[in-house]
Amino acid sequence: MASESVSSIRYGVTSQRTRIVLELSEKLDYNLFTLDAPHRVVLDLPAVTWPEQKPDDPSNGLIKNVRYGLFGPGKSRLVVDATGPVEVQKIFMLGPSAGFPYRLVIDLVETTQASFLARIAKRKASTPNKGVANAVPQVPFTPKPKTKKAKRVIVIDAGHGGVDPGAHGRKALEKNIVLAFAKALASTLKRTGKYEVHLTRDRDIYIPLRKRVNIARQYDADLFVSIHADSISRSAVRGMSIYTLSETASDKEAAALARKENRSDIIAGIDFGDQPAEVANILIDLAQRETKNLSVKFAGIVVNEMKGKTRLLDRTHRFAGFRVLKAPDVPSVLIELGFLTNKYDERELSSSKWRNKVAEALSQAINQYFVTAALDN
């Protein structure tokens, strides 16, 4: 655990500015920058512990929402969603005085969109290599001959994490629910002795979507399972669903979910200008067709195995353009365990008994998938 900490975050709003004050355990280095589409102010700090209770966002002023968490090894991040284009008028550190600890003070004022974009462009021009350093490169695609492995490789992806909490229940946060389930599933699979299992994250940290895909490809995974929990305005809706990749969504709800999940990098303050374009070629297209077919096959097995084990959403298998499912050579699915906005689902998803039962059922589905894959070959 980090020894440095942010003990509190508070706000001050006047007609001229909105002030953010972070109380710190000690003087810390920091880096602050702005991002567009949507308008965000991003503050990077060394790894710190944050207040357990998130302060209420100001009801007026220039801030819509603030979130924070571990962004990467040795780095924490605070992301401010602004109501529109803003300028950081001042940022300064105050030393301990009058009973207060170190304080980092950030003053935001309104500005024009043109001025906002000009400041972003100026920052990027002054640090030309920073984007390259922060970019997540794609793992080059080369068709691989099918080789028999001692153990099948499975990568389990706990969605969201760190600065991105995901869906909110009355008490539970998606990032915590899915990490607990991912660990339970990994333990269940390892106990079979049949699989080499890897987690994209094993703690409360944010992993960019492209990097999650890269992890699966770097391990030469035979299966990628991304674990999530959903939320919706209609609190009566509940049940598990499973998604596979398609550029055309199966329905409006699946399309909306994909848009929401694909915003994860935006929520975490990722600069898309730093990211290389996705590569397209005929070899990738051919490989992805086979991969999609295998993904659909696995999804069907999961649906059948889960019947009677947990509540299922109507039309349980759906499809849409999820960025995290885009490995061209790794069969991939995204499983929404249930809805944190439903009190019954939230209670089940928070239960170790339910978690272990469903992890066991998913393990059985994985066993069946690889048995049928071996027979097909």
Region spans (language model):
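Signal-peptide-cleaved, periplasmic/extracellular N-terminal interaction regions immediately downstream
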Residues: 1-153
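Flexible glycine-/small-residue-rich
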Residues: 24-26, 45-47, 82-84, 107-110, ...
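Short, solvent-exposed loop/turn elements at domain surfaces
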Residues: 31-32, 52-53, 163-167, 343
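Short beta-strand elements
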Residues: 89, 313-319
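A short, glycine/Asx- and small/polar-enriched loop/turn
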Residues: 100-101, 236-238, 327-332
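Catalytic-core regions of hydrolytic enzymes
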Residues: 128-279, 288-304, 308, 347, ...
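C-terminal, charge/polar-rich interaction regions
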Residues: 319-377
